[in-house]
Structures are given as C-alpha cells and as structure tokens.
Amino acid sequence: LCIDAASDWALTCVEQLPHQNHHVLIDYGAADGGTAVGLWNQVLDHLHTHQPHAHLTLIGNDLPSNDNVALAANLALQIPRPPKPTVLVSARSFYEPTTAPGTVSFGFSATAMHWLSQSPGPLPRHTHVLASGDAEALERFTAQAMQDWTAILELRSRELQVGGRLLTVNLSRDEEGRYLGHNGGKTRNVHDQLHQIWRELADEGAISEEQYRNGTVLNFYKSPEEFMAPLKDPTSAPYRHGLRLVDERTVHVSCPYRKRWNDDGNTAAFAAGLMATIRSWSRHSFASSAGDAAADAVFQRLEQRIADAPSEWSLDYVEHHQMMERVA
C-alpha cells in the first residue's frame, strides 16, 4: 500500500528523465523486493514507452544480511518482459556508496530510511523515543536522524546523474504528531504496548534490567520540515552537490488489517496478521538485546492483547513522499 501510494510520482520521475541510450534505476533498501514488483513493472513500462531505444538496468539494494537471493529472484521477474532490463543486486548499506558517481537516472526508496545508522545513546524508560516523553533522548535521536538523513542525501546526490530523479517514501510524523503506531489516540499507541510488554518481562525477571534498557527500536519518524531541511540549506552537502527539492507531500494510509477485520470480523486472523507486521520491523530490537526466546514472548503477548480488544488496534501509516532532482 505504501508503495502503491507513490506510483504516480514514480511515473512522473521517469517520464521527465533526459533522453539517452542507457538508464540505471535503483531501489534502495529493497528488502526481498516482493512488494515492489508491481511498481517496477509500471516504471520500466513507462520509461520504455517514452524512450523505447534506451537500455534499462534495475538494481536492487539492501544489506549483505538481507535475503538477497529472494531479492535477485524478484528482480529477475522483470527480465522476460519488454524492455528486458539488466537486473543486479547491490548488497551494501545505503549509508555507503552503492553505484559509481553520476550513473543513476532514477533512485527510489520505500519505508527504509527511517532506520538510524547507529545508536544515539540509551533510552532508559521506553522502547521508542517518540513515545517516551524523554526530551533529552528526543534531542539526541533527532540529531542522529538528521545527520543520517543528510549523509544519505549526499550519497544519493553523488550517484545521481544531472537530470536524475530521487523519490523517497518514508515513514513520517505529521503536523499533528501522528506516526506509524500512533494515530492520535483513535486506537492504542503500538509503541506504548510494546514497551509495556517489555517492561512486564523485566518485572517478571525474564529479562535483566540491562536487557530491558537495551531493547530500543533504533528508528526515527521525521517531520516534513526535517525531511526537507538539507535541501533548503545551501551549505549542506547534498545541496552543494546539486540535489534540489521538486515536490513533497504527506500521505495517510489506513491499516489494511483493521479494514479486513471491520469487513469480516475474523479476530484471530486480525491479531495474527497485525502482530506479524509489527514483528517484522521490531523483533530485531528485542532479540538483539535479550535473545530469541524473549523476543518471541513479546509477540505472543502482543497477539493476545490484540485478540482481547481488537477494536482498540489499528496500525495506520503516515508517509512522507519527497521528489528530488540533481540539477548540477
């Protein structure tokens, strides 16, 4: 759903690329690439329609620890279709260079760049900084997030060719302070629920106090102004390398699991599905601190909480879409 909501801007980006013999397109932080197959079908078709003689290369990027075999397989689904692109995997962090300078025509990233490159320090009384109420920690996490974002944009500005476009779809924080897991109080704050379960495990002695303190979700949902800031600062590295803001918007996407539950009333399926998607992005934070058994306990209890009060749960998305161009 998050990727689908950005498909119109992705098509606009490739439609406006300069005509040339070869284009490189890259998906940064692609995971296994499965959710983006449809988007890349559209993008490649659209670019091929506008530039039928250009050869297209599609690169999927993610960490070396990613399931890059699955990523390669999903990229390969594009090969039999016109325009029969070359497909490659770049198994590096997007906090590093991923291609040669000045080679990328269109860069895209969806729901990946909210993860921090390193810990900004302890979060002693919660598992997520935005739900913690800890002003000092918020200042540290914000500084790290902005340092990381500026570094990411500098790297992408170097990789883009002049006239190339970059489209980022990032989990965000809107003007009312809503973000993934917090929809303004319409339902429970997911991050508070995770923290309550984590605190329970510590109180029961299942994890130590040190493990409790280390169980921090190391991501940060930036505001639109924070996303745009490096592109409004002429002294920033991405700005000096020619990266400019073309357009931006905030998009809200309602929880698909909650919608399905509203329609069919299947509480067990709702609890299992919602738990699984929350687990997909938060489990590592708990397992790396206290091991697999403790992490498994978190999500067993989470699923039970959802099943006990399904009307009080919904994982609604707040996304920021940012379209950029390298002009020089």
Protein language model features and the residues they cover:
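A Trp-anchored, charged/polar loop motif used as the substrate-binding/catalytic surface
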Residues: 1-16, 90-93, 142-155, 223-233
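Intrinsic disorder
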Residues: 4, 30-38, 52, 139, ...
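N-terminal charged/capping segments associated with class I S-adenosyl-L-methionine
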Residues: 1-87, 91-102, 115-133, 168-176, ...
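C-terminal target-recognition/interaction regions appended to catalytic cores
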Residues: 262, 267-328
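A short glycine-rich, Lys/Arg-flanked "PGG" loop and its adjoining helix->strand segment in the class I
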Residues: 114, 122-162
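Substrate-binding/catalytic lobe of Class I Rossmann-like enzymes that use SAM or dcSAM, i.e.
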Residues: 162-291
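Short catalytic micro-motifs in class I SAM-dependent methyltransferases
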Residues: 111-112, 231
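A conserved beta-strand element that flanks and buttresses the S-adenosyl-L-methionine
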Residues: 108
